[in-house]
Amino acid sequence: MSDINGTRLPIPGLIPLGIPCVSDDVNPTLTRGER
C-alpha cells in the first residue's frame, strides 16, 4: 500500500482508478487532504 496520490487508502484498487468519490466514502479525512 503506497501513497501514490499522497493518500493512503485501505483499498489499493481505488488509488490507480483515481475515484475521489468512492475514496471519499471510505476515508473522507484523507480524501479532503488530497483535494
Swiss-Prot record:
Positions of the pro-segment in this chain: 1-10, 21-35
Record carries keyword Chloroplast: no
Keyword terms of this UniProt record: Toxin
Post-translational modification: Processed by the macrocyclase-peptidase enzyme POPB to yield a toxic cyclic decapeptide. POPB first removes 10 residues from the N-terminus. Conformational trapping of the remaining peptide forces the enzyme to release this intermediate rather than proceed to macrocyclization. The enzyme rebinds the remaining peptide in a different conformation and catalyzes macrocyclization of the N-terminal 10 residues.
GO molecular function, one term: toxin activity
Position(s), cross-link Cyclopeptide (Ile-Pro): I11-P20
InterPro entries: Amanitin/phalloidin
Signal sequence, start to end: none
Function, as annotated: Probable toxin that belongs to the MSDIN-like toxin family responsible for a large number of food poisoning cases and deaths.
Family the UniProt entry places it in: Belongs to the MSDIN fungal toxin family.
Protein name, UniProt field: MSDIN-like toxin proprotein 6
Gene: MSD6
